[in-house]
Amino acid sequence: MNTTYSSFTSLATLFVAERSEQSPVSYDRDTVITWGDFQQHVATLAQQLETQPTQNIALCFGNSYLFAVGFFACCHAGKSIVLPGNYQPEALKELSEHYDLLLHDADVSVSEQVGSLLVKAQSLVGITLINEPEAKQPYFWRELKLAEIPVTLFTSGSSGTPKAIAKTLKQLDIEVAILDNLWGDTVANTRVESTVSHQHIYGLLFRVLWPLCSARPFSAHNLEFPEQIVHHADADTTLVSSPALLKRLSEEHNPVAIRCVFSSGGPLPNQAAQHSQLLFGSLPIEVFGSTETGGIAYRQQHVASTPWTLFPGVEAELNHENCLKLRSPHIDENTWYQTADECYFHDSISFELRGRTDRIVKVEEKRISLVEVEKRLEQLPWVQESVVIPMEESGRLTLVSIIVLNDKGSDVLNELGKGKFWLELRKALRNWLEPIAIPRKFRVVDEIPLNSQGKRQVAEIEKLFQ
């Protein structure tokens, strides 16, 4: 596949800028979709959507190429875009107040109670729309007015009801331009493989919008297992991934050169960062941000204490609790946004993250930082990773923890047995923590339960103690 291109294009002028109809946009196995195909598919769907009376259209696709078709068809048809973060039928029903029509592909099952339109792909060569003829020619492309195109995303909702976050395509376009200014030369002439969903802001930006604006072809489907990365990636690949997958890479996987690796969605342990560099020859570029804020900062973790650098255009200061306060064009450049991320600034643009102040619980009137308990657990010589959560037990709030042991920890556990090992662990924690802050129950797991965005799955963790 020829992946040599030039120039970067704004989302506003993407469809009116000059580009060869034969340049590849997306691929799936041996099938390559060209720019000419993409234009035709977007035009076909846009014309159908223009006849729909509905305004708010939800997109829910397993196939990233069809998602891109749906996204830009909505833009050109003058529709508002809604991006549910969850494919599950009941979750889609729960969010139905936010949309009038759901556009989806065959990878997503939809309740009959939700108005929907199915988009099919035949080997990714042609796109078929239910009960609709081919696009009427010609279709006149126009420059998009980005500030007038609303895009609603949702927080992950892993421990509560998903929260709607309103953005505009202009805000997303600003982010894409910043990404290209920072790393455009690094990723030039690569193709994009991904392990994260385009339904969330990180995947939307890094695996769909930025590749389209910089004319880099992206895979229509995600890689789900470490073995697939090793098989599909090479020196002409940009990998968009998360700690959830990068932590699963092991010494058993054969090294493969990858041009650039991005990671976002949660903290990447230093051990995983260093192993990724050994395996891929590329130290992951970590991106810190959220659905609400967009990108905040980035770093390459040479050591665990490597500071974060603010993205260009992002202003930051600390409040009285040393929590990050932001102003940026990704949010609202005229107002400050308060986060719960405790930080220490080295200078005006670089800082260290200290944890989240909203992970404070009261146990028998004592304020306990779950972040600190996890930190103390991970300082022990036996523990690689930990998660601490509060749980109700017989009407009383207590702390419980799941831990991933390192090799030394596994050896000590086998030598002492569970009972004596937990006694030793609690004894060691008492050097830092009050008795009430020491978890009452522990479970050893092979890996922390995370979703595809790298967020902890609290419900799955709770099940381990029920």
PLM region descriptions:
Residues T3-T4, T13, S20-T51, K167-K170:
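Conserved AMP-binding/adenylate-forming core of the ANL superfamily
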Residues T4-S6, T13-E21, P133-F154, D185-V192:
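Conserved pre-ATP/AMP-binding loop-to-beta segment of ANL
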Residues T34-W35, W141-R142, P150-A177:
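Conserved AMP-binding A3 loop
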Residues Y99-D107, A164-L182, V187-R248, I285:
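AMP-binding/adenylate-forming
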Residues S250-A304:
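Gly/Ser/Thr-rich phosphate-binding loop
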Residues E317-K375, Q379:
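Conserved ATP-binding/catalytic segment of the ANL
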Residues V361, I389, I402, L425-Q466:
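Conserved C-terminal "lid"/linker of ANL adenylate-forming enzymes
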Residues L380-G395, V400-V404:
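C-terminal boundary motif of the adenylate-forming
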